[in-house]
Amino acid sequence: MDARRDGWQVNHKKIQRLWAEEGLRVVVKRRRKRIGVSTVPEIAAEKANDVWSVDFQFDSTITGKPVKILSIVDEHTRECLGGIVDYSITGLDLAEQLDVLAIDRGMPQALRMDNGPELISNAVAKWASETDRVFIPPGQPWRNGFVESFIGKLRDECLNVNQFYSLNHAKGIIGIWKEEYNTIRPHSSLGCSTPSVYAGQCTH
């Protein structure tokens, strides 16, 4: 029976409390996550430089200063190509980092990225206009599976087990971890090769 339809003043929180007191199941409507729409079709990473994934993490120093961590991963070779560790990272910072990587490795076919404010800045949009951008819808981090796996390892194996006394200390520790990830850690998906070794063997 709809109490509102019959003219009753209804307080939904009070009704939920009364239902709970009577042992009745309270159904709570949850907001659906907003799902965005990719601006270009999904592109499979079938060779090196097909798709670079970009994402951010956050940590802090022992004094409470926030630290931003940018990671760029090649989805095919699993290499961590580069990144930035700083108190703040702008779209221009990211564009400059991508320029450096493009000069060293060549341009990627696609740039898979989160829709964060840094990534939609004018500087990034201008750079990404030269590639086929692939946007990951907000609230759907699993769509960016390769870089999400990488930053999960970075979180569990580096950020969660280290205290950073300064920004430079954070840069050093994170840099060492990324180097070991690329050169020492074998990946089953790469035939138990390290990302660096596999990248050197890629001819397709």
Where in the sequence are the language-model features?
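Charged DNA-binding/catalytic regions of mobile-element recombinases
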Residues: M1-H204
